[in-house]
Each structure stands twice: as structure tokens, then as C-alpha cells.
Swiss-Prot record:
Gene Ontology CC entries for this record: cytosol; exodeoxyribonuclease VII complex
GO terms assigned for molecular function: exodeoxyribonuclease VII activity
Name assigned to this protein: Exodeoxyribonuclease 7 small subunit
Highest taxon of source: Bacteria
Role noted for this protein: Bidirectionally degrades single-stranded DNA into large acid-insoluble oligonucleotides, which are then degraded further into small acid-soluble oligonucleotides.
GO biological process, one term: DNA catabolic process
Oligomer and partners: Heterooligomer composed of large and small subunits.
Organism: Chlamydia caviae (strain ATCC VR-813 / DSM 19441 / 03DC25 / GPIC)
Enzyme class: hydrolase
Family, as annotated: Belongs to the XseB family.
Amino acid sequence: MEEIPFENAMARLEEIVDLMNQPSTSLDSSLKLYEEADALMRICESRIRKAEDRVRELSEKRNETLLSEEESCTH
């Protein structure tokens, strides 16, 4: 399930919430849906952490470049 695109995982989570809110959804079905939702949430959280790490990395590189450029201009 790890290969599912982030947007698809989020859309499926929304579907699961809708299904679980339906009175006709049985307890067994709700449990299976909950398990699926848990797996999808873990995937989404992992992708978000990776994206945050990448943004942080890019920001640090940009800041290092700016500092380096400032130092070269002052010398």
C-alpha cells in the first residue's frame, strides 16, 4: 500500500469516514475500514514527514548559499 499516491490515500480516507458514518455499516465492516484507515494515515504521516524534511533541507541549503554570498561580498 506504500506506493499509493498521497492524494489518493487522502481521498480514500475521506471515503472511509463517509462509510463509517453510515448507519448501515456493520461493526465488522467498520473495524476493517478502521484498519485500512490506520494504514493510510501512517503512509500519509510518513510522506508529510519526508516532505517537511526535504523543505527543511532545501531551506538550510538556501540559507547557506545566502551566507556564503554575503561573506564573499564583504571580503
